[in-house]
UniProtKB/Swiss-Prot annotation:
GO terms for cellular component: mitochondrion; ribonucleoprotein complex; ribosome. Its main location: mitochondrion. Essential for mitochondrial protein synthesis and required for the maturation of small ribosomal subunits. Belongs to the universal ribosomal protein uS3 family. It is found in: Mitochondrion. This is Small ribosomal subunit protein uS3m. Keywords: Mitochondrion, Ribonucleoprotein, Ribosomal protein.
Amino acid sequence: MKRINKDYLYKLTNNYIKNIDISIKDHYINEYNNKGTKLQRINKINSWDNQLYKFNKKNVINTWILDRLVSKLLIKIFKVRVNIINNNIINNGQIKDIYINKPKFKHTINKVYINFNYILSSNNITINDIDNNMNKYYTSIINDINNILGISNNNNNNIINKDNISNYLSKLYNKKVIIESNRLIYHYNDNTILNKMIINNMEKHKGGLSGKYSKILRTNIPVNNSILIRNKYISSIINNNYIKLNHIINLTSYNNLNILNIYNTLNLNKISKDLLINKYIIGLNVLYKGKNLNTAGISRSIKDRLLLGSLSNKLYGKYSNFLSSSLINNNNNNLKLGSSNINTNLNINKSYKLNYIPNHHNIITNNKVNKVKTGTFGITTKLNTI
């Protein structure tokens, strides 16, 4: 790590800065002159990633070039790949990534502040899987990063490594450089880091781009992980049942267990809210699954997607009469979803006796799909969300 540090610091020597090709500076000057001669065009004070103001246009260009060089340096340093050898956590050779967003610069009269976010990421473990050994490993990496960058400890302003990047950059800027790093826990706390993570992991999943994108989001964003929400809800039920049974066995511990309040944490409405809080309901999925009783082992299933809103397909094809406000006048038999009324007088929870399921099956007729023969036919529904 120390060798890598010296290699990057070598590129930032005063000799390197002074010997930058003049044509590069002219390129930037011409680029901004083409946009106008106003100094505000090159003044980065209104930019989200740089606050800089100098009265000399040449000094502005030179400082801005130096900022871009330092930004690339920090991004390169955080591309270090670390092999984890602990077989109890991850197999040998597994790579851990360190993602960083674009650093932000703030120039004052006598100081330069450099602020950025970063996250330690692993492909095979999650936050909940981190044990004490992994915490020690993370702490070791964070300490190494702080020593390389010259970030002082919260409890001690003394930096162990005096030959750090902060001190070296201070010589280049001719003013004190303070590097402020913010370690993130979740990728979605920073959109740049989230985009880098998605791009880096896109090829690690099978299927199309939309499927890969959905899998990555479900894994890294807890509010979109329906499996995590379901398991959490089931764990709450198991835990409450355990408390209840334990109370029945030990009746003397009534006051300590507070048995009357153990189900306050369970809310049937809350789990549906958690599952749909970041999703848009766009319609229904209706699954028809049947089997011919006379022919063992043969079954068929068909899925119909009934879409509403801007993606509505109710005006086309076989769904043209399924969603209609004129089918049933009784409001008790209508389910309002968006601006349309869905005919719920179809007894979709009933098992229908059918001989077969046609390839283009339609449920819009008033006879409630009653083609009675010798088979059984079940219908299930599910919300369509994006």
